[in-house]
Regions:
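Cell-envelope/glycan interface and biosynthesis
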Residues: 2-178
Length: 178
């Protein structure tokens, strides 16, 4: 039987960006420093090792971890996602309002999931993976086991005041200690 929502821990931890990755810049990591992991995501090479270990252990438990194509994002991809999902028109913004400031202007989320300001995404450091959660067992497995491989979420489903957190992305997991 799948775990109920009440039993989830929603493990959250802020990542530390490795200095060896910072030298290239967000979204500018050389191709030779990236690797395609077993789940299908292209990530920073040290992240791929932990991701592959997690993949095979999940498989042993009957869970197949699959990426939704959400691994490394170069700067151009981050910018394209930004313009696709964000707008300067507050009236077009999705409720509750998700806003970000970029280039001195306030932008509002118009559709889909929140997106980081270009050049600040953990995908741009090759640290994050977006998993396919179409099988409910996948999230339950990640919630329970991913932290032991160094993978955490970046936001909980609710804010401290109990309101829904519009920044919650259950599919988005980041290696915090690459």
């Amino acid at each position: 039987m799948a775990a109920s929502k009440a039993t989830f821990r929603y493990p959250v931890k802020k990542p530390v960006i490795p200095t060896r990755v910072q030298r290239w810049g967000n979204g500018k990591i050389p191709r030779l420093r990236l690797k395609k992991a077993q789940c299908g995501a292209v990530v920073f090479r040290p992240v791929a090792k932990a991701l592959d270990d997690m993949f095979f252990d999940a498989l042993d438990d009957g869970v197949v971890l699959k990426s939704l194509g959400g691994g490394y994002r170069d700067y151009a991809r981050q910018e394209a996602l930004w313009y696709d999902r964000m707008t300067l028109d507050k009236a077009e913004g999705k409720k509750p309002l998700v806003r970000r400031v970029w280039q001195g202007r306030t932008w509002y989320l118009k559709k889909m999931a929140p997106v980081a300001v270009p050049g600040t995404s953990n995908h741009g450091w090759g640290l994050s993976v977006d998993f396919d959660l179409s099988d409910p067992k996948t999230y339950a497995w990640l919630d329970r086991h991913a932290p032991s491989y160094g993978f955490f979420m970046e936001a909980k489903p609710t804010r401290p005041d109990g309101d829904k957190n519009p920044y919650f992305e259950p599919w988005h997991w980041t290696k915090v200690d690459a």
